[in-house]
């Protein structure tokens, strides 16, 4: 049985008419008492939801993730959702639309608090550069929205007041929720992103919290071009921040944190703009230093980043179209960088690495060779390692031995032309 919208409104309003569940509060500026239902009463238009109101199930809810202000209305399944994310971007000054301060704006004494919040949100949306093309997911549970709002509030409390007691719980929640595209877009706003970066740089914050902050950044941006665009168009120099944090974690031998930071950096280096910044900051040198001194897991993470970023022809072609300081310094930077990495990987494969990491390193090296053949100068030491299959099999496992066998002639030349041809079983 389907209820009409009119009947639904009548039922909700009738239930509240008894006045049993009403919330009253005093406005800070005017001292006037205002009252509203404990359970939000929806209409067909967007209305602001007070922080302590209960939102009935089945409504269409949207939220300004920077300050936690929510709006809701009756969900119309036939309605076309506008192609914008409601999350507020980076241009509104901090604190301008915080809900607690909205009742204190000058010249607004005759306007209700609800209307003030509406005006503030409308003003914020007009002043934002909101990314077109993303339709907010209406199927995200309200409980997730509430959890996210509370976690972002904990970030804000840390950034503004230095309160870190709730960070571990908040970061754990954000790490889990940041895989959702809508929440990833929200976390790419300047304030939450800067709070996460501040956590990474704060010597007083424990390593586990820093790891969760790095993973949250990475998950927010991975496969989320809308979020990445917001970061690129903001004033946050995320590439520099992550490279600086990586250099520091390398000095401190904090390998688990380094691995998480590499994960975050790999999510950022997906556009010509971010790769250009990586070049400007000599990011390859930072990663090579990390690779040489880091744990097996760090080496695996770095090799995967190189495969996903530098060994990708499409991104290389986009980068090649960029002119300016980067190209003036080195017209062949990309190829030179790949030569450096192919040498690093060839030298490390015969060394004592776990079979899992050797598989990642070899896969990255093979991708470079396959897509940028001239960027790999094959070394004798590496070929000797390839030409001792029994030794290689003991080090890398049967699966990678099979892969090398498939690649041998195509990527590394004819093994029978070498002195180990009689022993070549690959």
Swiss-Prot record:
Family stated for the protein in its record: Belongs to the SIL1 family.
Gene Ontology CC: one annotated term: endoplasmic reticulum lumen
GO molecular function, one term: adenyl-nucleotide exchange factor activity
First and last residue of the signal peptide: 1-17
SUPFAM superfamilies tied to this protein: ARM repeat
Record's keyword annotation contains Signal: yes
Name of the molecule in the record: Nucleotide exchange factor SIL1
InterPro entries associated with the record: ARM-like (IPR011989), ARM-type_fold (IPR016024), Hsp70_NEF-Inhibitors (IPR050693), Sil1_fungi (IPR031884)
Domain of life the protein comes from: Eukaryota
Pfam families: SIL1
Span of the annotated motif Prevents secretion from ER: 423-426
Induction / repression: By the unfolded protein response (UPR).
Organism: Yarrowia lipolytica (strain CLIB 122 / E 150)
Subcellular location: Endoplasmic reticulum lumen
GO biological process: protein transport
Keyword Signal carried by entry: yes
Keywords on record: Endoplasmic reticulum, Protein transport, Signal, Translocation, Transport
Description of how the protein assembles with itself and partners: Interacts with KAR2.
Main function: Required for protein translocation and folding in the endoplasmic reticulum (ER). Probably functions as a nucleotide exchange factor for the ER lumenal chaperone KAR2. It is not required for viability but is essential for optimal growth at elevated temperatures.
